[in-house]
């Protein structure tokens, strides 16, 4: 007897999470892998949009107490396919202002959809130089923006979380 294997799907992962601390501000760079799994290509090319939402949180570590949430930024993007012009369009829905990106290649559109650069979290002057901070990123990808338990079980939505290393603004001696 031959058994049919279920199609493999790519798991949503946060590949690069970089936190940059300089004299002026705290910025974050995030790259999401698997934002457009192969199983969703047919749905996207038939006109159903895919949504990606990044929730970037800046936390302060406090010893022997619960950590304190300092600020949150939400960035939401949409990937839509125009059947007539055969173009993929990536539009920013929330959290950033950028022009609509159009491409005939899904790979290029998926790269623009899943890469977030220079998210400004907080001015450096607003943070205590001796405080220990870290960044937590929660990413969601879903068809038509519907990220529910049923959608995740059906394979049309996924979510993941990743936390950065602990950092401080002052140099350790």
Give the ranges of each region predicted by the language model.
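N-terminal signal peptide c-region/cleavage motif recognized by signal peptidases
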Residues: 3-7
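Short N-terminal segments immediately surrounding and downstream of signal-peptide cleavage
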Residues: 9-27
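Primarily extracytoplasmic ectodomains and periplasmic/lumenal surface modules that are beta-strand-rich
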Residues: 24-26, 33-42, 50
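A beta-strand/beta-hairpin structural motif
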Residues: 28-32, 83, 89, 94-96, ...
């Amino acid at each position: 007897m031959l058994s049919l294997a279920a199609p493999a799907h790519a798991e949503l992962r946060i590949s690069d999470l970089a936190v940059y601390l300089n004299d002026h501000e705290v910025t974050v760079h995030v790259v999401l892998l698997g934002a457009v799994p192969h199983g969703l290509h047919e749905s996207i090319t038939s006109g159903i949009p895919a949504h990606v939402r990044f929730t970037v949180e800046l936390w302060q570590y406090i010893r022997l107490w619960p950590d304190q949430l300092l600020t949150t930024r939400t960035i939401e993007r949409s990937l839509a396919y125009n059947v007539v012009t055969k173009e993929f369009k990536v539009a920013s829905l929330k959290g950033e202002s950028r022009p609509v990106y159009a491409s005939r290649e899904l790979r290029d559109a998926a790269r623009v959809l899943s890469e977030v650069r220079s998210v400004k979290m907080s001015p450096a002057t607003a943070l205590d130089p001796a405080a220990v901070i870290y960044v937590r990123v929660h990413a969601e990808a879903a068809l038509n923006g519907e990220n529910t338990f049923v959608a995740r079980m059906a394979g049309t939505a996924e979510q993941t979380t990743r936390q950065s290393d602990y950092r401080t603004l002052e140099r350790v001696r």
